[in-house]
Amino acid sequence: GESHLHDGRVCQDSSASFSDECGTVAVVSDGHGGCDYVRSQIGSAMACEAAVKNIRRLFENISPEAFLAEPDMMLIQLEAAIINDWNESVRSHYEANPFTEEELDCVSEKAGASYRSGHRIERAYGATLIAAAVTRDYWFGIQIGDGKCAAFDEAGICTQPIPWDEKCFLNKTTSICGSDALRDFRHFYSEK
């Protein structure tokens, strides 16, 4: 955020949250800052919206008992639904707002050729995503990309419960726009 303000660039980060009788959710998404990701500020907002929508749907439609009977399967289905909704949002936005020449002039030659042909346009919207949810019966975190999800227990001890991804190193990260996004998602859950 601060460097974007200093350099006069658009901040590509987004966040969302909600809390109701079912649970509490916090979501953050970091748009990719590279030149080829000219719509990542839009993509990060879409990622947050997709996560909130689908976590809310999970809370409303899946009982705690059903979730806890197969938590890994439930979280993989949640991650798949988020990816699907994000891709649908990207496609709808792109169809209503094709790339401008100004946007295409900013990207690499390779990305420009791809975007002009309508191929892999979702890369322009690329973003990471971290979401954490707490209910009375369980809590979980899901993540794709770099960044850290920190959790504090009642004693104030901090942990990072979502497993780290070795593919996220230095300037490299996995992304919701990746062709292996579902495989690249990772998660954690607990009853405590």
Listing of model-derived features with the role each one plays in the protein:
Residues 1-192:
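PP2C/PPM-type serine/threonine phosphatase catalytic domain
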